[in-house]
Amino acid sequence: MSYLVISFSHKNTDIKLREKLAFNSDEDKDRFLKLILENDITKEAILLSTCNRVEIITRSLNIKQSSKDIIEKLATYSKVDFDVLYDRADIYDADGAVHHLFSVASALDSLVIGETQIVGQLKDAFRFSQAKGYCSLNITRVMHYAFKCAAQVRTATSLGTGSVSVASTAVSKAKDIIGNTKDVKALVVGAGEMSELTVKHLIASGFDVTIISRDTKKAQNLASTFEVHVNVEPYDKLTQLLITTPIMITATSAPYPIITKENAPSSNINRYWFDIAVPRDIDENISMSNLEIFSVDDLQDIVNENMSLRAEQAKTAYGIVSRMSLEFFEWLKSLEIEPIVKNLYLKGNEIIDKKVKNAIKKGFIDSKDEENIRKLCLTVITEYLHNPAKQLKDISKNMECDLVVGTVQNMFSLNENSTSKNRYKCDHLSKN
């Protein structure tokens, strides 16, 4: 059994392919996770789908077979040829899968190094699979350590400061284009988490912000969370606002373009539209004078600047990821050893109990001496097992740990199930 991660991201796929791979609803995610868990080789699974990546995180009995099965099902879902997906996919297993997952959680694999959204998105994906029963002990353990790693990276580096999200990068680009942002109108289409971040950065940059959404009530609630005044307009005014507003950033979860060649108006002013949604909100075929359209992949210049400024911090962060990956596997081995050590002592107590009762029954010892004899036997067992227990704990740091675990279980007839029911709570799940 090994960890397996199949990754499609901005590093190996363009936005056109990521649009087809994106999971836009919980229903789609639920159906896909059910499908990949139907076979006997994929045991637990999490699906992470964001504007820049689709990651399938699993435990598998057969890496090659499981990878092929998952990509086949993804090909059916996305209507993309299997060979195309298989050639593009980054497939990680065992320690490589853990290192990649920790890098993703720590925002080192993001389009914008150090962006702050990914760990929350990963927690949401984990919660979803937990609630549906699609992941249990093994995935919980690795996710716990992934969030622990991300927290250490944030604490030890300054990667979480500055322009560190797709939304903030889009706003930074808009600010570079406009120059003086005082009284410059900016329109945000959508009222979700990405839109909230966008509004926050637009306000901080001095723009006059308007929110528009199909759900006007949701837009009003979002606007009310800011200390400065944020305008809210009904959705039927979208076309009119697109004519008069120089900056527009759209981040809806619509599964299809909401701004098309048919409804995109022309204008006499210079306009700059930023589409940070995947699938894209703006039809890629729109082209007119005085209009520039930027997708997520078009923000690469700022991303490259971001990466060069953060290179030293990223080096420190990767060191943390590597160390935490090694610690994780050592921790896993210790979790396997500790229940065995405990069971050895329990087994000794069971034997003491059985033999003392039998001796009293046969008249070999007086019942009034039972407590003292138990104490003596327990002292003997404890002293006898002390060195083997210490050796077992030391062996947990070595590669032969798995072999030793099985051997000790067989030698002492220990119940294997008792060592595998150590359900682990993810302490970092409730933390932001």
UniProtKB/Swiss-Prot annotation:
Free-text comment on this protein's domains from its UniProt entry: Possesses an unusual extended V-shaped dimeric structure with each monomer consisting of three distinct domains arranged along a curved 'spinal' alpha-helix. The N-terminal catalytic domain specifically recognizes the glutamate moiety of the substrate. The second domain is the NADPH-binding domain, and the third C-terminal domain is responsible for dimerization.
GO biological process, one term: protoporphyrinogen IX biosynthetic process from glutamate
InterPro entries assigned to the protein according to its UniProt record, in alphabetical order: 4pyrrol_synth_GluRdtase, 4pyrrol_synth_GluRdtase_dimer, 4pyrrol_synth_GluRdtase_N, GluRdtase_CS, GluRdtase_dimer_dom_sf, GluRdtase_N_sf, NAD(P)-bd_dom_sf, Shikm_DH/Glu-tRNA_Rdtase
Family designation: Belongs to the glutamyl-tRNA reductase family.
Active site: C51
Site (Important for activity): residue numbering on this chain: H100
Biological function: Catalyzes the NADPH-dependent reduction of glutamyl-tRNA(Glu) to glutamate 1-semialdehyde (GSA).
HAMAP family in UniProt: Glu_tRNA_reductase
Gene: hemA
rRNA-binding in keyword set: no
Classification via PROSITE patterns: GLUTR (PS00747)
NCBIfam families: hemA
GO MF assignments: glutamyl-tRNA reductase activity; NADP binding
Catalytic activity: (S)-4-amino-5-oxopentanoate + tRNA(Glu) + NADP(+) = L-glutamyl-tRNA(Glu) + NADPH + H(+)
Presence of keyword Transmembrane: no
Keywords associated with the record: NADP, Oxidoreductase, Porphyrin biosynthesis
Pathway assignment: Porphyrin-containing compound metabolism; protoporphyrin-IX biosynthesis; 5-aminolevulinate from L-glutamyl-tRNA(Glu): step 1/2
Species classification: Bacteria, Pseudomonadati, Campylobacterota, Epsilonproteobacteria, Campylobacterales
Protein name, UniProt field: Glutamyl-tRNA reductase
E.C. designation(s): 1.2.1.70
Chain positions recorded as substrate binding sites: T50, C51, N52, R53, S110, E115, T116, Q117, Q121
Top-level enzyme category: oxidoreductase
Note in the entry: During catalysis, the active site Cys acts as a nucleophile attacking the alpha-carbonyl group of tRNA-bound glutamate with the formation of a thioester intermediate between enzyme and glutamate, and the concomitant release of tRNA(Glu). The thioester intermediate is finally reduced by direct hydride transfer from NADPH, to form the product GSA.
Signal sequence segment: none
Positions annotated to bind NADP(+): G190, A191, G192, E193, M194, S195
